[in-house]
Regions:
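Catalytic-pocket segment enriched in acidic/His residues
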Residues: 1-128
Length: 128
């Protein structure tokens, strides 16, 4: 969601940090600069939405893998995989941080609030 204070140019300049903290003490951290992606975010958005692809409530555009984890998690040569209880945090100075705890889908409440519901909620509270 863009406004006068945050634009596509801010996306293009964003530097992101991803941190995984496991309940057993495992830590993985990496960073990525949006300036290094191969296609412009505005071009990608234009390819995703148009006359043949409508999204009345908007859509989320994922811009690629920040980095491929190469740190072994459970022993040499075993690679990386998430574990239940991991805290995954993605942050950038301009937006702050988003943190989620890894759980299995059968143990979490269903996702029922989309972008349209968010906008209605904000409008009802006079925040738009």
């Amino acid at each position: 969601l863009f406004d006068a204070g945050y634009s596509a140019d801010d996306v293009r300049r964003a530097d992101l940090v991803l941190r995984v903290e496991g309940p057993e003490g495992f830590v993985l951290e990496g960073s990525s600069s949006m300036a290094r992606i191969s296609r412009d975010p505005v071009d990608l958005a234009a390819q995703a939405i148009g006359a043949n692809h409508q999204y009345p409530d908007g859509f989320v555009l994922f811009l690629g893998t920040m980095f491929a984890p190469v740190k072994d998690r459970h022993g040499p040569g075993q690679g990386f995989t998430h574990a239940v209880g991991d805290v995954v945090t993605v942050s950038t100075p301009s937006l702050g941080a988003l943190a989620n705890r890894v759980r299995t889908s059968d143990t979490v409440a269903p996702w029922t609030m989309g972008a349209g519901a968010l906008m209605r909620n904000l409008a009802a509270r006079g925040l738009l």
